[in-house]
Amino acid sequence: RFKKIRRLGALPGLTSKRPRSGSDLKNQLRSGKRSQYRIRLEEKQKLRFHYGLTERQLLKYVHIAGKAKGSTGQILLQLLEMRLDNILFRLGMASTIPGARQLVNHRHILVNGRIVDIPSYRCKPRDIITTKNKQRSKALIQNFIASSPHQEELPNHLTIDPFQYKGLVNQIIDSKWIGLKIN
């Protein structure tokens, strides 16, 4: 993880750690002139590592975004941001996207009253995301919500009720709330 962060910069979904300022100096010395290919590859890798996608998953999302009307880049980011694992991360129910994936895989999360164990589940507006009624599930989410540093900067397309361990997707995400800097 730390090699990826040093190479690509801060990836908030992958880990909460930040690259040290000294590593930037090292990158500038060996970088030289950046070709268009290198810039595109780095941006693609940022997307992959931030959202925890495989190459094939990313290609599927690019294909879906290309077919839809509108800007392909904006639609791609909207598709990625509406994934269940990412919404849990944005709500503060998990500290990282891999942590949110684990919560979903271990069947701690309900969407509209049904257990969903697929992290790539695409959430829709008016979806209600809650925890299982088990004490262990609630304790896990409570720890994450209590230690969540970005509770006050919740995106406007999401609302959370921390006492009932419930999140609500109000609408499709607006592009200005995406925390990743992509060129």
Curated annotation (Swiss-Prot):
Keywords: Chloroplast, Plastid, Ribonucleoprotein, Ribosomal protein, RNA-binding, rRNA-binding. Its main location: plastid. Disulfide bonds: none annotated. InterPro entries: Ribosomal_uS4, Ribosomal_uS4_bac-type, Ribosomal_uS4_CS, Ribosomal_uS4_N, S4_RNA-bd, S4_RNA-bd_sf. The keyword Acetylation does not apply. Residues 82-143 form the S4 RNA-binding domain. Transmembrane segments: none annotated. Pfam families: Ribosomal_S4, S4. One of its GO terms (cellular component) is small ribosomal subunit. GO terms for molecular function: rRNA binding; structural constituent of ribosome. GO terms for biological process: ribosomal small subunit biogenesis; translation. It is found in: Plastid, Chloroplast. Belongs to the universal ribosomal protein uS4 family. HAMAP family: Ribosomal_uS4_B (MF_01306_B). PANTHER family: 30S 40S RIBOSOMAL PROTEIN (PTHR11831), SMALL RIBOSOMAL SUBUNIT PROTEIN US4M (PTHR11831:SF4). Part of the 30S ribosomal subunit. Contacts protein S5. The interaction surface between S4 and S5 is involved in control of translational fidelity. One of the primary rRNA binding proteins, it binds directly to 16S rRNA where it nucleates assembly of the body of the 30S subunit. With S5 and S12 plays an important role in translational accuracy. This is Small ribosomal subunit protein uS4c.
